[in-house]
Amino acid sequence: MESKLGLNMELVDQARASAAKVADDTQQFIDQHTTVTVERAVCRLLGIDGVNDMDVPLPNVVVDHLMANSLLPVGAAWAIGNAMVETGKDPQGVADAVNSGELDLSKVPAHSDAEIRGAITPVVNATMERINKNVAKRNSYLKEWGDKEGPYLYIIVATGNIYEDIIQAKAGAKQGADIIAVIRTTGQSLLDYVPYGATTEGFGGTYATQENFRLMRAALDEVGEEQHRYIRLCNYCSGLCMPEIAAMGALERLDVMLNDALYGILFRDINMQRTIVDQFFSRVINGYAGVIINTGEDNYLTTDDAITAAHTVLASQFLNEAFAKSAGMREEQMGLGHAFEMDPAVENTFLHELAQAQMAREIFPNAPLKYMPPTKFMTGNIFRGHIQDALFNMVTILTNQRLCLLGMMTEAIHTPFMSDRALSIENAQYIFRTMKDLGSELTYKENGIIRNRANEVLTKATDLLKEIEKLGLFTTIEKGIFADVKRPKDGGKGLNGVVVKDDKYFNPFVEVMKGKVGA
């Protein structure tokens, strides 16, 4: 891609190399550790499902049992496989026996690795076949109906009731939306378990559960078949259960997942060691399942200034790209995030927004960039808000952003009505249609505001990444360099769920998934 901004590609290469070094150094830590939610995700992928009489999910029952008996370092796959050899039960049977007290995994005689792997491999293969069928079904729909060119129209539903969400999601799809995201209930990030079953009460969103995923997937397939369009489903694998939600999404054919390497640390005060380990397995799963991940750089601009902190967004995009590559993801699955969040009271911010978006497109040419609408400076004036969203839509189409979360004129007033979404979709469709090829007609003046701004941000981001390379990721976060938020290495939620792996440890799903996409 020819650079319209005259970007110094040597600086881009230096920034990417620094980010890769940071990711490689951090990967050494990841490879040595596992967490309770990584092992619960393994349980789920082995087919363990359901809850006990106290509504505790059985993956939690098994992993809590492993933790209490100092078995977590060997991993769920080894412990369950060993019990399968001894008892002849399948993983669900092992979980049921642990729950009833019939089976104590710490007292099962140790069998050979060959026997354990022999017992567990058919179960792993069955799960992989299920995920492969989901990938094939998505590809079949896309082959039959084609995929959309230009930006995906991306909307949110958030009623708290999955059945109400389905009504709103189907309406949004019929109005023209391409991606439906179901916002999670407030605080689900901080639950160290995944709720079970269909849910009808949430706060600011709807619980992410496997049954809710299944219900919404079926509803969107139904409306997609009516419209002859594939409607993508999005949810959120951030928080204390990142890999579990990724596993559930892979099993139920979700298409897009919010999945940032740093978001939980910065914005939910989840321990950085926990998050860094969890994000790796979640991305391995998403990569194999053909899921597009969305990263959360847009959130930095809610706590920091979008003009002065723009280089931290770019630096984080480089890091998220590097961590995704470490997990075997393809660039085409990396929905690196940024946002239209500059203060509209400042002169020439539209030019700065355009520079930032074009810069991201040129630096990450294969990534389906996720572009977020204005929220911080939405005042409740719906007329001004609609214009702010229109300017955002203009930048989207001029710079070929791919996942365009549509702004709502009623931002800062209430959760959107179906009519609000209809107007938002109409706004975007009008601009995307009438300006479809305008971006290819434009060049940017040498030494002008747009080119100078982009090169200034790139230079600062490259310098910052060189500093992070020296400091290491954990120290960088402790210093508050991202989002102006400081987090201690040994603080936050979830650190007690991180353990060093035993020599016997293995994760069969990383072995078969990493660097591959299901077929």
Set out the residue ranges of the language-model regions:
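Catalytic cores of alpha/beta
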Residues: 163-170, 240-253, 308-309, 383-397
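Hydrophobic alpha-helical bundle architecture
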Residues: 356-420, 438-448
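Alpha-helix-loop-beta-strand connector modules within alpha/beta enzyme cores
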Residues: 143-144, 194-232, 276-293, 350-367, ...
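Long, compositionally biased, glycine/small-hydrophobic-enriched stretches that function as flexible linkers
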Residues: 1-163, 171-176, 184-212, 239-245, ...
